[in-house]
Curated annotation (Swiss-Prot):
Main function: Atypical MAPK protein that regulates several process such as autophagy, ciliogenesis, protein trafficking/secretion and genome integrity, in a kinase activity-dependent manner. Controls both, basal and starvation-induced autophagy throught its interaction with GABARAP, MAP1LC3B and GABARAPL1 leading to autophagosome formation, SQSTM1 degradation and reduced MAP1LC3B inhibitory phosphorylation. Regulates primary cilium formation and the localization of ciliary proteins involved in cilium structure, transport, and signaling.
Pfam families the record matches: Pkinase
Lineage summary: Eukaryota, Metazoa, Chordata, Craniata, Vertebrata
Binding residues for ATP: L20, G21, K22, G23, A24, Y25, G26, I27, V28, K43
Modified residues annotated as Phosphotyrosine in this record: Y178
Post-translational modification: Autophosphorylated on Thr-176 and Tyr-178; activates the enzyme. Ubiquitinated. Ubiquitination may allow its tight kinase activity regulation and rapid turnover. May be ubiquitinated by a SCF E3 ligase.
Motif (TXY): 176-178
Similarity remark: Belongs to the protein kinase superfamily. CMGC Ser/Thr protein kinase family. MAP kinase subfamily.
Protein name listed in UniProt: Mitogen-activated protein kinase 15
Active-site annotation: D138
Regulation of its activity: Activated by threonine and tyrosine phosphorylation. Inhibited by dual specificity phosphatases, such as DUSP1. Phosphorylation and activation in response to DNA damaging agents, serum stimulation. Constitutively activated when phosphorylated on Tyr-178. Activity depends on the relative rates of MAPK15 autophosphorylation and dephosphorylation by PTPN1.
Amino acid sequence: MCAAEVDRHVAQRYLIKRRLGKGAYGIVWKAMDRRTGEVVAIKKIFDAFRDQIDAQRTFREIMLLKEFGGHPNIIRLLDVIPAKNDRDIYLVFESMDTDLNAVIQKGRLLKDIHKRCIFYQLLRATKFIHSGRVIHRDQKPANVLLDSACRVKLCDFGLARSLGDLPEGPGGQALTEYVATRWYRAPEVLLSSRWYTPGVDMWSLGCILGEMLRGQPLFPGTSTFHQLELILKTIPLPSMEELQDLGSDYSALILQNLGSRPQQTLDALLPPDTPPEALDLLKRLLAFAPDKRLSAEQALQHPYVQRFHCPDREWARESDVRLPVHEGDQLSAPEYRKRLYQIILEQSGNSRSPREEGLGVVASRAELRASPARTQSLKSGVLPQVPAETPARKRGPKPPRSPGHDPEHVEVRRQSSDPLFQLPPPGRGERPPGATGQPPSAPSGVKTQVRAMAPSLTSQAEAQAANQALIRSDPARGGGPRAVGARRVPSRLPREAPEPRPGRRMFGISVSQGAQGAARAALGGYSQAYGTVCRSALGRLPLLPGPRA
């Protein structure tokens, strides 16, 4: 890691472990919070406010992650830290082991039950997003994060769009141009339709499901025209009415040129052992007409994910998500930056410099539920259990607890030592909802630690007044001030330590590195960069080559 890549005030707060990836627009590290010990992922966006488009994308992603961060299948944004140059920005996320794209490229790693579990959690996240009238617009395997317990987190909301501020009807939901991964684009996006619906996400989910079943992308087009060709020779051809409903100016011409190509079915693209219900769900998601595709709520009731279906855990918002800046308003890049920092500082209730302390995104205040200790890994063939999470904070009553709730789950409230993250403590004599007089029992093998309650400001002032002592200078002991009658602390006295004697091992460490392996000799230490997955069974499997978008 180059020291110049991380600002000093960020390195003081987070201990950088290793670099996870780097691209043209940013770099991601695995790090540890020095205050709490929590492992996090830090994403540095280069020149996040270089122009109006990049500034708007950064603004949308942060605002939407603050809205959706309490959902168990959406990545949590923990902190926002401006860079020293006022151009870059650091986003601090919870850490995950890998992503679905890396898992698929490992080969036949996922069993059928894992595929069902992963797709069910993706549907849960998509339903929650769509209930707020937000479209992700960039769902693909690389944006689906996983851990060894088969937990799913949807990330990268940079291309997401809120429809809450737009008028109803096709005229209000105008389709703007955006650069998303071609292999997962819906036909209406490829045909430059004048409007769109949440069906664009459902098409992308169908492509993700097909890639999990097949082991490689369903439609790996090399251009927009080739992408349409692969789609139209696989799915049933649309009617003229369906083409007219898209509002595309040249969709009929494209269909005329591509409609005469030989057809193949989805069955021919998938392995012969594909479950029939998986194929049925895939066909219902990959419909050409957006209004004929299943919604996320309908797909959650499909037999393919029936064993995981639980309405109490499939949350929905009761109101639309409305961004602080109207979707129709176009601000300049400096205005987006100023507005972003102003909003987060106002919501955190703190006026400190964001460059020194971070902006303290309030998404970390969501109540979480600890995962059970006996969670199965991806390598096991046992049915993965989707954790029953605490409902996200939203307007309206909370949904009742699932009948299948695991009693060993322990409800915790995440707090940080940073005052920007702290929740207001309960009043005198109050306890948080659901708290009892005794601390909750921890799972076996977990060492619990009980800390004494910190004294209040009143008790501290009384103790200070009662223990006041006359302070005088003691020139015989170095001239420092000392309290009369106070006992001297030996650790503060000058210590006359003996001079260190040379020992056997006081020589250059490079002498012994050659016998400790090539990795340690070359790198000065054992690096985790040799594997893409940490603390899981995924890293032991060979990497199979596969196409990438």
